[in-house]
A protein has these predicted regions:
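S-adenosylmethionine/decaboxylated-SAM
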Residues: 1-161
């Protein structure tokens, strides 16, 4: 978005569009599979929105985004296997749950560079402890300063050093 001429910088979005594929013992007991699904036709709407944005950008003939449907624990692994050149500059986790967050953190670890940013929607959130547990297990909490916005207490990020 901030580098409209950099055709190597892409936005890759992963979603089931159908809600959580499942939960684990590290997740709250009040959530279940299929919770938090997207509204009808949201996938199509988002695709149209991204395509419109693309047409308004320089070098609009080169597609710089991709939406991938499915359980990210599987689809991210497949994406990285098919695109081994991937260097991740920014990854945002709004997965809410332990297993997919941990799976993804493990998968992207070798694709991060100094300065890469990992953003989280539910870090240190007692309602969804899975993101915090996964980050703690994969990266540890003593290696990074957790940054937060002063106007939004939920979202946070770390910078790989």
């Amino acid at each position: 978005i901030l580098e409209p001429f950099n055709h190597n910088r892409k936005i890759i979005g992963f979603d089931t569009w159908e809600g959580f594929p499942g939960t684990s013992s590290q997740d709250p007991t009040n959530i279940k599979a299929r919770d938090y699904g997207a509204t009808k036709d949201y996938e199509k709407y988002l695709e149209e929105l991204l395509q419109y944005h693309e047409t308004e950008s320089p070098i609009s003939h080169i597609k710089k985004y991709q939406l991938i449907k499915g359980d990210i624990s599987n689809t991210l692994q497949q994406y990285l296997e098919e695109n081994p050149e991937t260097i991740i500059s920014f990854a945002y986790f709004d997965l809410d749950l332990y297993k997919p967050t941990k799976d993804c953190l493990r998968l992207i670890k070798g694709h991060l560079a100094k300065g890469s940013v990992l953003g989280f929607d539910q870090l240190n959130d007692g309602n969804f402890p899975g993101e915090t547990i996964a980050l703690k297990e994969v990266f540890g909490l003593d290696k990074f300063e957790i940054q937060r916005s002063p106007i939004s207490p939920l979202q946070s990020y770390i910078i790989i050093k």
